[in-house]
Amino acid sequence: MLSELDQACIDHGFFLLSGHGLDDLIEQTWAITEQFFAGDRASKLAVMRDADNPLGYFDRELTKRKRDSKEVFDFTDPADPRTDQHNRWPADSDTFRGTLVEFYDACSDLAVRANELVHHALAFATASDIDATASLGSRTTSSVRLNHYPVGDPVPEGERVGLHDLGETALGHHTDPGVLTLLLQDMTGGLQAQAVDGSWVDIEPTPGTIVVNLADAMQVWTNDRYRAAVHRVVPMTSSDRYSIPYFFNPPRDAVVEPISGLAGDAKYAGFRWRDYMRARTDDNFADAGAEDAQITDYLLTP
């Protein structure tokens, strides 16, 4: 199994998890997600994201300078007062918040195990002595996002003045910035991954499974052995789509750099996670006039 996982991480950076034991909690999380997005607009705008705080509701996010056809709700670790003070919870949302707190905790545990599994595959394939936790520390900056992809524009017509045009896809092609992402997707479909040859492959929804995609920090840690998954979402034409990613991220002050135990010269200069993440979130909020931050910015030999 480890050799197969190693190959999947090399080829496209995607694999599926089953037998996770979270089915009941996932059903509850789906229910409150759909209820939130079906709620009145005033309630959502009351917890709207701004340039200073990327948490809360947003319906005009940019990917590679194109507006996405989705609305989202983001939150980070609700058990830590230092981070929860920045979360924007809707009014009268005890059930909403309680369910998402439980979901965050369960995904945090599962992400640690998924990260360990990937590192076991890496150590097995490279005959290296690698510590899966050495680059993480105790406090990550992980977050959860609730996604709703409607048929059509998520922004009401009267609010579109001055906004970027919608992109050709519901979510433009990109990689996630962190370590790995645990993704729940409903049965609508629409997620695509880019293969090594550049073609796009449908990631068909499979009941009872969680999609895992590797992200930028993992590609840097493994010195390009493993691939941050390039993915996108095609536009919805007949029914809405919902998805829920848990972004497993390094600690705020972590330095992201290739693992020293791997053979070969380092391909990347180290960089601070907080600086990289800030650049990525800033560009999602407003067009910085250039390509968004990428790990290729830190290649030692471009």
State where each predicted segment sits:
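Peripheral, non-catalytic segments flanking oxidoreductase cores
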Residues: 1-302
